[in-house]
């Protein structure tokens, strides 16, 4: 099974009051062509679909058309929300569009969502961890001591039964310690949003978003 991993589309972004939507539309067409040429079975979109939590109608229409083209040949699409997105907005109609092969992380309810895919030799489980602030996790898991982003993610992962007999992929939109940043990301003061990569050791592949530079962290997969 072949996966195409992307993130941080930031649809609707402007530069000096100039809309980038025409350029973004051209890039999305290229991505669809890459997915077709590489015969990708699924596409992983790891957060920050939109530039704003309340995206303009044109940006939403562009993303809708993009996803529709991706799934037209039976391809699966997995989407999580990032720090720029509104989880309720991203996940609107999520239960309905699952029938089309589009899986969107819903607003956090205390557990992490997953989808199991059948492959030729072993099942593949795709886990979806949207961007979560410590306060969001604390609200759902009041018994946990949560002060940092790492505390929050670890609390969620402790409640996640990852089966090592299966192949496990995680979509995640957080800042991972050791990643190389560019000048376009939003960071928390003092590095409070840092999460150590070792917390994800149970997963075979972690599809990261949030950092606007392709890279590998700790290990090759």
For each of these PLM feature ranges, what is it?
Residues 1-68, 72, 170:
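N-terminal active-site segment of His-dependent metallophosphoesterases
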Residues 38, 74, 163-165:
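A structural signal for short coil/turn segments at secondary-structure junctions
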Residues 42, 77, 166-168:
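Residue-level recognition of the N-termini of beta-strands and the immediately preceding loop/turn
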Residues 45-48, 80-83, 208:
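Glycine-rich beta-strand-to-loop/alpha-helix junction loops that act as flexible
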Residues 55, 85-221:
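His/Asp/Glu-rich metal-coordinating catalytic cores
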Residues 75-83, 102-103:
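Hydrophobic or amphipathic alpha-helical targeting/insertion segments
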């Amino acid at each position: 099974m072949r996966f195409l991993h992307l993130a941080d589309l930031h649809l609707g972004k402007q530069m000096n009051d100039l809309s980038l939507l025409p350029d973004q539309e051209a890039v999305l067409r290229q991505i669809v062509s890459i997915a077709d040429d590489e015969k990708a079975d699924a596409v992983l979109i790891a957060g920050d679909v939109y530039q704003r939590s309340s995206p303009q109608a044109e940006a939403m229409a562009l993303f809708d058309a993009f996803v529709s083209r991706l799934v037209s040949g039976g391809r699966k699409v997995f989407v999580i929300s990032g720090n720029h997105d509104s989880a309720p907005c991203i996940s609107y109609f999520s239960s309905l569009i699952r029938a089309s092969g589009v899986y969107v992380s819903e607003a956090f309810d205390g557990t992490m969502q997953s989808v199991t895919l059948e492959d030729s030799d072993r099942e593949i489980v795709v886990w979806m961890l949207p961007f979560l602030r410590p306060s969001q996790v604390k609200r759902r898991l009041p018994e946990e001591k949560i002060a940092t982003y790492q505390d929050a993610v670890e609390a969620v992962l402790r409640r996640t039964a990852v089966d090592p007999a299966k192949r496990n992929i995680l979509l995640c939109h957080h800042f991972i310690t050791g990643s190389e940043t560019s000048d376009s990301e939003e960071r928390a003061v003092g590095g409070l949003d840092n999460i150590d990569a070792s917390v994800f050791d149970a997963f075979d592949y972690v599809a990261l978003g949030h950092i606007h530079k392709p890279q590998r962290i700790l290990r090759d997969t």
